[in-house]
Design a protein with these regions (language model features):
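Glycine-rich cofactor phosphate-binding loops and adjacent beta1-alpha1 units
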Residues: 173, 177-257
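Glycine-rich beta-strand-centered segment in the early N-terminal region that forms part
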Residues: 21-39, 47-82
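Short, glycine/polar-rich helix-capping loops at beta-to-alpha or helix-loop-helix junctions
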Residues: 83-84, 161-169, 244-249
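Conserved beta-strand elements of the Class I
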Residues: 29-30, 133, 235
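C-terminal hydrophobic helical "lid"/dimerization subdomain
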Residues: 225, 270-322
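NAD(P)H dinucleotide-binding glycine-rich loop of Rossmann-like/cofactor-binding domains
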Residues: 61-64, 74-136
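Active-site capping/gating segments
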Residues: 257-275
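Mid-domain Rossmann-like dinucleotide-binding core that forms the NAD(H)/NADP(H) cofactor-binding site
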Residues: 110-184
Length: 322
């Protein structure tokens, strides 16, 4: 079969042929793939620097995708084998796709939903009427997250980012306040303090970590013994601005901050089933009705090597079609 093959860690996958995978045990399903998104996770695994980097080479790359089961059902699934190929093997934890949702959109959405709905709904337990801050919201996942927060009834949706044009677009998607990130982290801290005093922030979804997140933490710090706190649930879902922060004991002792992470390692098997069987079907229906949007750029499998590292428009997901 044809596929996107990785021959060496740190190299770009190439178009080639490899043996078609077969079902090995009960609970596995063969899928004829029609579309698969290229995500940061996929690139990290091919780099050799990710904890889940590929080991047996050559191999088909791609973590998830869309296609048809042997009975003709069109589904989204996460691959037991690589998904950017004509055929793959997935588990029973797949999600049927509505008829009026196209393959490219269905392939592009799940990772962004995983990175936004799971932090919001599963980790932070967002409730209608709460105020949410997305730190680093101008990427694909942040843009989807803003729409999901609005869908679930968030009152104030504050977003940060460097791309002013995307920040303006986020207002149309549900953002109520936008903050432009610069190198002046002290200014960000003061802005967050002012917002938090006026409309207490209940949930923070952070995609950046590093210095911008450090400023947000500092903004929540209580400054006197009579400080009256409100609970702030902070979920880290990325580290695009840095791998480390400086967390002092005083920050955690002076206010009620609940700091947690969201990612494959922090989500239980049961939570991932909820994602595939409850959350994702709901989001697919929203997208099919035109109420959840994602920007995509699609290219055929044959040009995988040329487009793998292509610079896309901000907030756009690359999708490979087969």
């Amino acid at each position: 079969m044809r596929g996107a093959l990785l021959y060496e860690l740190g190299q770009v996958p190439k178009f080639g042929t490899i043996d078609e995978p077969t079902v090995q045990k009960e609970g596995q399903h063969a899928i004829r793939v029609t579309a698969a998104a290229v995500k940061n996770l996929d690139k990290a695994r091919t780099s050799g620097k990710h904890y889940a980097s590929y080991t047996d080479l050559p191999t088909v790359v791609g973590n998830d995708g869309v296609g048809y089961l042997e009975d003709g059902t069109r589904v989204y699934g996460q691959g037991i084998t690589g998904m950017i190929a004509e055929h793959a093997i997935i588990s029973s934890n797949y999600t049927p796709i509505p008829k009026n949702l196209d393959d490219v959109t269905a392939a592009a959405l799940p990772n962004a939903i995983l990175g936004s709905a799971m932090p919001l709904i599963i980790r932070a337990r967002l409730e209608a009427g709460q105020n949410v801050l997305f730190n680093g919201a101008t990427g694909v996942t942040g843009q989807v997250g803003v729409q999901i927060a609005k869908h679930y009834g968030a009152k104030e949706i504050i977003v940060t980012g460097r791309n002013k044009a995307i920040l303006e677009q986020l207002k149309a998607l549900g953002a109520t306040q936008t903050l432009v990130l610069t190198e002046d982290n002290d200014a960000l801290e003061e802005q967050i303090k002012a917002i938090h005093q006026a409309t207490p922030i209940d949930v923070v979804i952070d995609y950046l970590w590093g210095k911008p997140f450090q400023s947000i933490l500092n903004a929540f710090k209580g400054n006197d013994i009579n400080h009256l706190t409100s609970t702030v649930k902070i979920v880290t879902a990325g580290d695009m601005a840095g791998k480390e922060i400086q967390l002092t004991s005083a920050i955690l002792r002076s206010t009620d901050i609940q700091l947690m992470g969201s990612g494959f390692g922090s989500l239980t098997k049961e939570e991932l089933i909820v994602f595939n069987k409850v959350i994702l079907p709901e989001m697919f229906l929203l997208a099919a009705r035109g109420k959840l949007h994602i920007q995509t750029e699609a290219h055929p499998l044959e040009v995988i090597e040329q487009v793998w590292n292509k610079t896309l428009d901000p907030g756009t997901r690359l999708v490979i079609t087969l």
